[in-house]
């Protein structure tokens, strides 16, 4: 099948979702040669991946991932402003590859959101776009990445947050590692990570490295049945909601996709320079995460609050972004968010 798929894609013809599923199953079963894999993902990149193609690939990766089973039968009753719903699982994740070298914003947000009563399955890896990926900073915060799926499940169920280390849970990806490394360009695999959470997170805030991906990835999330989510791209290049200017965004719901723009001012924040959000290596970024969760004021706190507000809205923990920002601030100022780091470190060691 992959030879026929390559022949079709080099003629700039799209694959159906079913065809993509067939090809991805071949790749992840080890049935394709490195040359075939490299040719296929390069041709797909040159043509441009469609929603159907990305969705098909994501379905296969989800099916082949080691599952993380999280209890969803608990009702969150600490809400009086929205309807009660079955407990949701949230992921706050970026594609990486934005090249901005900011501190670990989505990881910091994950601790805050979990302190607000939302179960967070943080899916991540080592560095892509900076000197420090989510896995790198978590190690320096004392979190053990070498844990079993059962330990990850226990973390999420008991303290509300667990880290899903992608290489440990996507074993079938090993067949694509060599071709990806050797061709050295961004391919469909660079955008599949945020779509393939092994805990089947049904709510999500996803950052992407190019604005053209906002609507496309939102379309994929909608197609894959995301309960509620936001796809964002800071127009300064960040794969987060930025404080330096505007953010292109899409809201995903069962009804469809809504495109809109976010500005810091609409939520009471001042714009800042990119320099104010810069990070460093894993040791430096771990210190920044602790400082922000310890109550340090300034742009780092504000960008984390803004992103957390949208994450809490996606998870149904609040009715508005403004209410989510208030909840996030309370989680920091009470010490609850910082305590989540210690709980996760203790439970994984």
Curated annotation (Swiss-Prot):
SUPFAM superfamilies, per the entry: Nucleoside phosphorylase/phosphoribosyltransferase catalytic domain (SSF52418), Nucleoside phosphorylase/phosphoribosyltransferase N-terminal domain (SSF47648)
Q: List, separated by semicolons, the cofactors it needs.
A: Mg(2+)
Detail which positions bind Mg(2+) 1: 106, 240
Q: Which residues are noted in the entry as anthranilate 1-binding? A: 94, 125
Which Gene Ontology molecular function entries are recorded, alphabetically?
Answer: anthranilate phosphoribosyltransferase activity; magnesium ion binding
Q: Give the record's keywords alphabetically.
A: Amino-acid biosynthesis, Aromatic amino acid biosynthesis, Glycosyltransferase, Magnesium, Metal-binding, Transferase, Tryptophan biosynthesis
Q: How is the cofactor bound, as the UniProt entry phrases it?
A: Binds 2 magnesium ions per monomer.
Please give the Pfam families that the UniProt record associates with this protein: Glycos_trans_3N, Glycos_transf_3
Q: According to its UniProt record, in which pathway does this protein act?
A: Amino-acid biosynthesis; L-tryptophan biosynthesis; L-tryptophan from chorismate: step 2/5
Reaction catalysed?
Answer: N-(5-phospho-beta-D-ribosyl)anthranilate + diphosphate = 5-phospho-alpha-D-ribose 1-diphosphate + anthranilate
Binding locations of anthranilate 2: 180
**Gene3D superfamilies referenced in this protein's UniProt entry, alphabetically:** Nucleoside phosphorylase/phosphoribosyltransferase catalytic domain, Transferase, Pyrimidine Nucleoside Phosphorylase, Chain C
Give the CC-aspect GO terms. Answer: cytosol
What Enzyme Commission number does this protein have? 2.4.2.18
Q: Which residues bind 5-phospho-alpha-D-ribose 1-diphosphate?
A: 94, 97-98, 102, 104-107, 122-130, 134
Any idea which positions bind Mg(2+) 2? Answer: 239-240
InterPro entries found in the cross-reference section: Anthranilate_Pribosyl_Tfrase (IPR005940), Glycosyl_Trfase_fam3 (IPR000312), Glycosyl_Trfase_fam3_N_dom (IPR017459), Glycosyl_Trfase_fam3_N_dom_sf (IPR036320), Nuc_phospho_transferase (IPR035902)
Q: Which GO terms describe its biological process?
A: L-tryptophan biosynthetic process
Function description: Catalyzes the transfer of the phosphoribosyl group of 5-phosphorylribose-1-pyrophosphate (PRPP) to anthranilate to yield N-(5'-phosphoribosyl)-anthranilate (PRA).
Tell me the protein family, please: Belongs to the anthranilate phosphoribosyltransferase family.
NCBIfam families per UniProt: trpD
Its subunit composition reads: Homodimer.
Can you name this protein?
A: Anthranilate phosphoribosyltransferase
Q: Could you tell me the gene encoding this protein?
A: trpD
């Amino acid at each position: 099948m992959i030879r026929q798929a390559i022949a079709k894609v080099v003629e700039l013809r799209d694959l159906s979702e079913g065809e993509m599923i067939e090809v991805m199953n071949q790749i992840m079963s080890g049935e394709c040669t490195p040359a075939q894999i490299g040719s296929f993902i390069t041709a797909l990149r040159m043509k441009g991946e469609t929603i159907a193609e990305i969705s098909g690939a994501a379905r296969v990766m989800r099916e082949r991932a080691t599952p993380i089973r999280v209890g969803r039968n608990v009702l969150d009753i600490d809400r009086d402003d929205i309807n009660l719903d079955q407990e949701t699982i949230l992921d706050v994740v970026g594609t990486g590859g934005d090249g901005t070298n900011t501190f670990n914003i989505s990881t910091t947000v994950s601790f805050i959101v979990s302190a607000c009563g939302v179960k967070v399955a943080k899916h991540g890896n080592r560095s892509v776009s900076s000197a420090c990926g989510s896995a790198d900073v978590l190690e320096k915060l004392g979190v053990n990445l070498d844990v079993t799926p059962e330990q990850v499940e226990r973390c999420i169920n008991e303290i509300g947050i667990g880290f899903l280390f992608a290489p440990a849970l996507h074993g079938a990806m090993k067949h694509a590692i060599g071709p990806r490394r050797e061709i050295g360009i961004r391919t469909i695999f660079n955008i599949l990570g945020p779509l393939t959470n092994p805990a089947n997170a049904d709510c999500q805030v996803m950052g992407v490295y190019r604005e053209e991906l906002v609507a496309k990835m939102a379309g994929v999330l909608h197609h894959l049945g995301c309960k509620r989510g936001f796809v964002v791209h800071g127009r300064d290049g960040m794969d987060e909601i930025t404080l330096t200017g505007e953010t292109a965004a899409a809201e995903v719901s069962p009804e469809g996709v809504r495109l809109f723009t976010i500005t810091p001012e609409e939520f009471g924040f001042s714009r800042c320079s990119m320099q104010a959000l810069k990070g460093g290596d894993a040791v430096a970024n771990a210190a920044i995460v602790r400082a922000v969760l310890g109550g340090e004021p300034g742009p780092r706190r504000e960008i984390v609050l803004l992103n957390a507000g949208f994450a809490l809205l996606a998870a149904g923990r609040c009715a508005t972004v403004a209410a989510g920002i208030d909840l996030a601030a309370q989680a920091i100022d009470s010490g609850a968010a910082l305590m989540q780091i210690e709980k996760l470190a203790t439970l994984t060691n």
